Amino acid sequence: MDAVEPSVEKEYKKIISFRDTVFEGKHQQFLVPNNVRLKFLRDRLHKSLKNFDSVKRKVEIANDEGNNKLLKSSPKAQTRDENTPSEFKNGGFSNRESMSENCFSKSSTNLPRLDINRDFNSLLNSQTKPEATGLMKEDITPVVNTSKQSSTGTQEESSKPEKSNKLLAKSTLSLYGNQAFNPSSVLPSNSSSTPKENKKNVNKETYQPNTFRRSPLKNDTGSVELSNLYMPSPPSSALPVSLVSAPSPPRATNVAVPCLKHLESSEQGNNLLINKAFTSPRLPSPPQSTRPSSTRFPSVPLSDEKNSIVSVKNEEPSVILGNQSPISDLHPYSPSWIPYPKELQSLQVNRIPELSLENNVMSTRDYKDIMPHPRPSAVLLDKPVSLDQTSHPFPHQNTYILPPGIRNSVDYDGTFLSRKSLPPYNGIHRLHESPSQFSNQSRYNWEPILENRSLLHLNRPPPIETHYSYESNNSSFSPYYHKRHRQISPYYPTSSVYGVYESPPHMSDSRISRQHMPLTHTTYEPSAPYYNDYELAEEIERRRHHSFYDY
């Protein structure tokens, strides 16, 4: 590769180091004090004024000569000359070399409105040519305050300078701010009575405009303040140090979600121990003494803090599991709500409860001792069927005739001839009612939950769908829509309405006749596939979400 020029390499290094300092945030570590900043601006101003030093010297020498010759009798001029600081008389400022040479170009400054070189050059060019601006040479002469000024002169001469004087005053104001503006020193007199000898000393080279300010810049804050008005906002180095680079976003408040992570089983294993759970900000709980637990449970002492939920701030335990149930626990949206009944004393949080014996599939030989019932009717009877009186668990099984309007023969055995003997069926097809929130129904809204909370009453096959869904074969979305069986029967000729196994509602419905076992079977063989509780729950869930034929 070609070697990079050393100057370019230097520039690259500068850029890279600057970028690194910015990335590491080092440029924010420096505070620039106000006086340092003022000094920097002052030095920059001197730098831009440096070209004027030679011109200023000549003008001052000429002024001094003229003043000494013509105005020896004037005390004002002498006192003014004495008041002028020595650094101005000697020409140039004492600290004008403090800035390094190559920092800024000599012709201009970065500060807007302080680009004094350019302004003065334009003033020089315009005012040294009286024809261009209409200024007379009398107006260009440096001002000397004498007590002997006469007010004679023609009006034509004085009217033109007035406009230019206003212009001069405006430019001076904009250059130096209010502090710098001294009208007696800036504005030339309206009279043209200055002695003519003075005009001889003024040449184009030695001209110094009247706007030059004769007070030392060391005490000057006006020009700096003025430049600050026009400067952009200060760099981040001028701002106070912040430890964090960006302000952190507002924190969200803690919201408690009851979660198994917070639940730990205790050492004994039969008590539910909740060590710590997050509580959302709420009103502080009342002190222990005011709680009415002593009146409600006089014999039971207050539970120790181990069994209580403690918030992060270690405030007073707001939920006590042992003997009280605050209202917030009963409310299902409160942060401390526990989604299982507290009345169960020896509650263990198991995702999958263990199988008891009666929930398992039996062999045929012990069905007389414990009989799992495949029909809900036998389970929900007040007195279970005694197997001593009958040889078969469902003695009248296929001997009865269904009324023609009822398809749901699954719910019916020989023991029932009408729906009135059944408990209210809370099945899927009761669409007009929504289940009450705290009712004693199971989650899927089937039958009332039994005391042992088993799924035995779900052991029947689901009822036949009477309303066609979009997942059935009838819908045009079904893949089997065009491949239906065209059934031929004496009652219903070929019809395009019913799909596979979906025949009109009468007794010869293929599914109904298949589900009922003929009387010749003496062994207990359930006709529908028999599941244990877990398979059954799974199957029910699956059949609720998919159509019967979507295997």
UniProtKB/Swiss-Prot annotation:
GO BP, one annotated term: nuclear mRNA surveillance of meiosis-specific transcripts
Biased amino acid composition, Polar residues: 92-111, 143-156, 204-226
Residue numbers of Phosphoserine PTMs: S74
GO cellular component: chromatin; MTREC complex; nuclear body; nuclear exosome focus
Keywords, comma-separated and alphabetical: Phosphoprotein
Chain intervals for the UniProt region annotation (Disordered): 66-111, 130-165, 180-229, 277-303
Lineage: superkingdom: Eukaryota
Bias kind Low complexity: ranges: 182-193, 290-299
Entry protein name: Uncharacterized protein C7D4.14c
Source organism of this protein record: Schizosaccharomyces pombe (strain 972 / ATCC 24843) (Fission yeast)
Lineage: Eukaryota, Fungi, Dikarya, Ascomycota, Taphrinomycotina
